[in-house]
């Protein structure tokens, strides 16, 4: 059932024939709105194109799902695999299609699409549009050729529409739109409809453990200290530097947007603080999302990877983070105390000798005993997540209510559906499935044993320090506080060494025990019985090693495969499916005394699938609160007012989880309030709808050389300018430079080039490199080959190094530049490249617009490039002749190509061979010793010599 505010939005969009920009609150079914507009589209109006960016793939799947649920034909996607004639027929069919901006812009420039047959274009990611984006390039061309085509842009991220200066106004200008439609959650029509039949909501606040409270407090203290340090730089807007804003990913964007232009002037300490704030935000998130052992794994990974460079590791409160995280998992006790306690009663936790001397190990009921006389032992604590117990209680309560309704013979058809549990990510889904299928303590024990095994692997990877790293003065110290024992040297202290040895002993014992159990069990690994009538099963995530399968059967680990080394949650593999269902007949494997559970389906919020319309659950447990999903629940209940729906929200009381959820709602409301104010005062030009554009118009025109022409020359008349054109490689349309060149009035000719990225004239070829691509090309050696090909076929080969406009115009800060010439330094690599290719010219560009100005200057005294000739460059003809080969004037190119294909000859040594040998015949007469000197090794020289001396096979 379509909601009334949905119908109102659709009618508002259809009223304006030119289109408009729709900004909707997150979770208010943007996909359903777009699907409704596609269903209302008539083929007689013309073809409708939906620009599909990589970030809009989940939105595309939702649109297709909603259209197919109404038995309407779903739009197909136009891909590059389709031939040009087939794409042309699709463009003229009048149906809606998904298409990527790169394919569409190339077809527009090559005139493979009849623009007059287009009814309109949908922009699915309006919040990511800028003046230089490919989508803006497309709209400008379409509007110049077909001013009646409508443009409708959509976004459900209002926060992104207010980031930066006049973001909304610039977006509307780039899309040639004059009308904006704002539909926040607090809009009267929306709030009334969603609150008319609200679901039954149960808000459960779970108290965090004392250690979790201590860790959260310590992280916030460290984060606050880092923010205070950043404020001292006087280079960041202090209003944005708050702990609350630091809880969101957008905080990184805010800080980097301010610091990127001056990034090369910042010291190492400030740069590290930016990275540390991102790490601390992850710690706050992982604290409430994952179990105690996984959190400790991630901390250990940080301690190894970040080393002395991190400032936050040396803060006074950081010790509490590591200490409390350890106490949630294990504690160290004296071996003498363990021995005395074992005389009184058996301990359920495992004891391990710090020296690794285990007199007896018994594996009975999950218990082990270690007889030791000295040292310390590791005693398991394995604190369970407080939410786990609450989740199981809710499931048991739900099943009891359903049984009562069944006995009372009430109509409970709506209450027998699947219980949906919404989690943040796939890893949480898998772990919660294990918890309700098995004993939570068993799950924690599996994680604990994997953690111990990872300790062994981590120790084998560590290399001894050859030389102590010299730390810059004041670097790694926060607020002037230096810890008594640094984390890097913690293993060197007495207590730290004892703890490390105790963990190694425990890990070794588990490793030995796992091998013994694996040998005893052999191939007999029974799986628990699964009753598929009581649950549905999605595709589960792969286990990191085969150890988990062994643990499922005997609760012990094997060591046949490598244990997990990087235990951070972001390193977990994601499942291909959107969600995971459980339990696998929880009643068959549930612990004794546990109650029966209803069928449960775990849903990962990050998958962004229309799970509510597919499963139609009657009970939903929001394990990880998310604002967008809460709105989806409201819309789902409003669309199904007669269906009973009970929603449980599980929060950690007084945690950053609650603070982040409430702040996300507040930030969205503030964004809409800002948009409403902007809309009331927004000045929109009358011709912004594109109706006044000519066929050859563009937003900018290059300065004419005849602007200052003398009046005595032909009465002051300006000579007719010849249209400048640039040949652009197809792959370059992933960047924004072709768009900017088109804005400058240049004609863009997209072709597939074998040599170069941009052809400015018959003699000028340009290879464009962004900073990241430049480093990668040097590493792979691709740049050397590209420059070699340009030098071979063009008189003026040019390497364009293009910086981002909002970042620093520098490779590195002045303090990082050393006097030493090293082969790994980027400046050294560029110097060697220029020395090797003397005709190569380097261009340094500050931004896209600066590049366009440089191209205009370079083309001022040059002829226009020939498209046909540029396509043939580097491509051999049927006779094997390559046109415009400059190297052929001095070298026999056929002989050179033959030489490079000989065994042992590579790009690194064929030039030295050419300098020594004048012909292939002379090369064949050289002895192995001389070849070894030329080729840089005896092995490659021997392979070439054997090839040259090989006998020619004959049939006689």
Curated annotation (Swiss-Prot):
Composition-biased stretches, type Polar residues, lie in 697-711
UniProt motif Nuclear localization signal: location: 256-272
Instruction: Report if keyword Nucleotidyltransferase is assigned.
Output: no
Q: Which UniProt keywords apply?
A: DNA damage, DNA excision, DNA recombination, DNA repair, DNA-binding, Endonuclease, Hydrolase, Nuclease, Nucleus
Q: Which Pfam families match?
A: ERCC4 (PF02732)
Some GO term, biological process aspect, for this entry: which one?
Answer: response to oxidative stress
The places in or outside the cell where this protein is found are:
Nucleus
Note the effect listed for residue 756 to D.
Answer: Loss of DNA repair activity
Per its record, what are the GO molecular function terms? DNA binding; single-stranded DNA endodeoxyribonuclease activity
Q: Any one cellular component term from GO for this entry?
A: nucleus
Tissues where the protein occurs: Isoform 1 and isoform 2 are widely expressed, predominantly in flowers, meristems and stems. Isoform 3 is detected at low levels.
EC class: hydrolase
Which residues belong to any copy of the ERCC4 domain?
725-805
Primary location group: nucleus
In residue numbers, the region (Disordered) covers: 343-363, 516-593, 697-718
**Annotated InterPro entries:** ERCC4_domain, Restrct_endonuc-II-like, RuvA_2-like, XPF_nuclease
Which Enzyme Commission number(s) are on file for it?
3.1.-.-
What exactly does this protein do? Seems to be involved in nucleotide excision repair (NER) of damaged DNA (dark repair mechanism). Involved in repair of UV light, and probably oxidative damage. The UVH1/RAD1-ERCC1/RAD10 complex may act as an endonuclease making DNA incision 5' to the lesion site. In vitro, is implicated in double strand breaks (DSBs) repair and is required for homologous recombination in the presence of non-homologous overhangs. May mediate the induction of a DNA-damage sensitive cell-cycle checkpoint during the G2 phase.
Oligomeric and partner information: Heterodimer with ERCC1/RAD10.
Name the family.
Answer: Belongs to the XPF family.
Full protein name:
DNA repair endonuclease UVH1
